[in-house]
Amino acid sequence: MTTNYIFVTGGVVSSLGKGIAAASLAAILEARGLNVTIMKLDPYINVDPGTMSPIQHGEVFVTEDGAETDLDLGHYERFIRTKMSRRNNFTTGRIYSDVLRKERRGDYLGATIQVIPHITNAIKERIIEGGEDHDVVLVEIGGTVGDIESLPFLEAIRQMAVEVGREHTLYMHLTLVPYMAASGEVKTKPTQHSVKELLSIGIQPDVLICRSDRSVPNNERAKIALFCNVPEKAVISLKDVDSIYKIPALLKSQGLDDYICKRFGLNCPEADLSEWEQVIYQQANPVGEVTIGMVGKYIALPDAYKSVIEALKHAGLKNRLTVNIRLIDSQDVETRGVEILKDLDAILIPGGFGYRGVEGKILTAQYAREQNIPYLGICLGMQVALIEFARHVAGMQDANSTEFVPDCKYPVVALITEWRDEDGNVEMRSEQSHLGGTMRLGSQLCHLADDSLARSLYGEATILERHRHRYEVNNMLLKHLESAGLRVAGWSGDHKLVEIIEYPDHPWFVASQFHPEFTSTPRDGHPLFAGLVKAAGEYQKRAQK
């Protein structure tokens, strides 16, 4: 199989939406029957995003094989059926780490290690490895053309055209075409200068994606084509839209997929975008709306909860309901009380780390339990629900997690020190373990209890869900919690770790140790989120009576 490569770069400014554009194009190509995958190359020095602040970087997206990756991989999985893996995302830090390890081992036989060829060769090797067994691989280069950090990646993809053949490589460049209100026209000069910067590196773009708040007029597209040495049909206008799921149809309407298939000599049928048309129809035709409060500590940057927010929207599609998400700082709950939680149809507490804001989350879980408000807890959201239950129902007033109070009287949540991974290998951790790459990560088997709400939502006895955490329910105290009314609705594959808890006396109270948001998609949704939104609609109807 010959793999074709589409390299996606961005210019003028950051945050143009390279990831969304790449994912949308991949969705069209997949709809034409092609085997497609997407890679993200990040120029920062961190080995991976696992220890980066969510406020700076946004969420860490966890793949099936346990890689902690850029949030763009979440977009990729939401747009195409191909599952991402650790091969789909790597950083400058990872490349340098690998090269230096080989140098220390003596693999380079005493050679002087340089950016060219050693770093660029390592980048190319990873790109080729990630694209194996695929018809098309889209490779998104993080950052903006002109950044010093991106230069090794740009040099590597320039060399790729020489090594795999220009007929199997295509350079797609996203650029800003701003609208000037004073003159009433769009300006193409920033695009011209961005392309000039790429040309100075040795890369001639084949496709230009022109980002603007409005459609770029045909005469301006012709001007861009002339000055940037790109066919006019390869200058694509990508205006702002109210839903990212409209972008595949927008790109297809301008013939981008046809142009690329002809460029690569691929003979494939027309794209069937009927599934995306259904998604857009569901978005545009809700029969009602609900308000769900998401209580967290990173709400200053909503991208810190990107997959959770998208999963709630997907659940809205499945229930034909518009989901209004109210972001609530858990510290505000501590200082202002549960009054700020009123008028919510459901409550969700997502994952997180550290003690800041935890007591506000515990108050939130208590409020949801006592007021019979639908509740979904994820990771830390399950742990705070457990702590709240232990304190106020099971009579364990000093209950806590050893993450927050190491010597607490009732450590209902404690550090996992030993477990088996998905391959059966024993993993061990301690309080002294490094933070990076030392959590229980990736897709894990979960057995659902026969009489549980979770079993009825999933419709099957065993499921696979993704994890990212160090702390677990302390089984030593579990019997006391169960005798007080707690139900364990899901166990790990070896039946040793609690994965889901429920409160049978509550209309809808589910909390999971895993992260269900990572497997939700606009076309399929996710059972837990769909169940939460449905329960929110039912709660709203009861409250209005």
Curated annotation (Swiss-Prot):
Coiled coil: none annotated. CTPSs have evolved a hybrid strategy for distinguishing between UTP and CTP. The overlapping regions of the product feedback inhibitory and substrate sites recognize a common feature in both compounds, the triphosphate moiety. To differentiate isosteric substrate and product pyrimidine rings, an additional pocket far from the expected kinase/ligase catalytic site, specifically recognizes the cytosine and ribose portions of the product inhibitor. ATP binds at S15, L16, G17, K18, G19, I20, D72, K239, D240, V241. The gene is pyrG. Allosterically activated by GTP, when glutamine is the substrate; GTP has no effect on the reaction when ammonia is the substrate. The allosteric effector GTP functions by stabilizing the protein conformation that binds the tetrahedral intermediate(s) formed during glutamine hydrolysis. Inhibited by the product CTP, via allosteric rather than competitive inhibition. GO terms for biological process: 'de novo' CTP biosynthetic process; pyrimidine nucleobase biosynthetic process. Homotetramer. Residues 1-266 are annotated as: Amidoligase domain. The active site is at C379 (nucleophile), H515, E517. Its EC number is 6.3.4.2. The lineage of its organism: Bacteria, Pseudomonadati, Pseudomonadota, Gammaproteobacteria, Enterobacterales. L-glutamine binds at G352, L380, G381, M382, Q383, E403, R470. Catalyzes the ATP-dependent amination of UTP to CTP with either L-glutamine or ammonia as the source of nitrogen. Regulates intracellular CTP levels through interactions with the four ribonucleotide triphosphates. One of its GO terms (cellular component) is cytosol. This is CTP synthase. UTP binds at S14, K187, T188, K189, P190, T191, Q192, K223.
